[in-house]
Amino acid sequence: MDLSRHQLMLDIGGGSGAHSIRAVSVLPNLRALILDLGPICEVAQEFVTQYGLQDRIRTHVANMWNDPFPKADLHFYSNIYHDWPPERCYFLTEKSFKSLEPGGRIIIHDVLYNDEKTGPFAPAAYSMLMMGWTEGKSYSGAELSGMLKEAGFHDIQVHPAFGYFSVVTGLKP
């Protein structure tokens, strides 16, 4: 997946900023904005400073449910969707679609079931934990692709990442 044309990644629920730090380290034209709650942004800023990336990564204190998304051409969610039921995930998907300009991309990075939801074991076990601790569950690539399609995204693709993680991506036409 070629991300070289993107200039600003909004790392939604970006936590420590680990994904933003890695992304800007390998994509020289990319800047990142970590969107999270105040105390979490403070921690992320410490890591950004530790890596000397203050000129390329900023933090933005906001609540992903209630506050508007700042302008960006790439929306990135890592380990977010599994915390929420389908209707909340769709809300985020649609919010990204409305916020992105044409040509903008969404990327969802998460532990995924196979499309038949028969395995693998790790996402199934993880789903049980999520159902007990959060409102969420594990999803399949097909389920997340369906959410992206319903929201209006095109060129939807699922790519395996590391371990049981995959990325689901789509473009706003």
Predicted segment positions?
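Alpha-helical subdomain
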Residues: 3-173
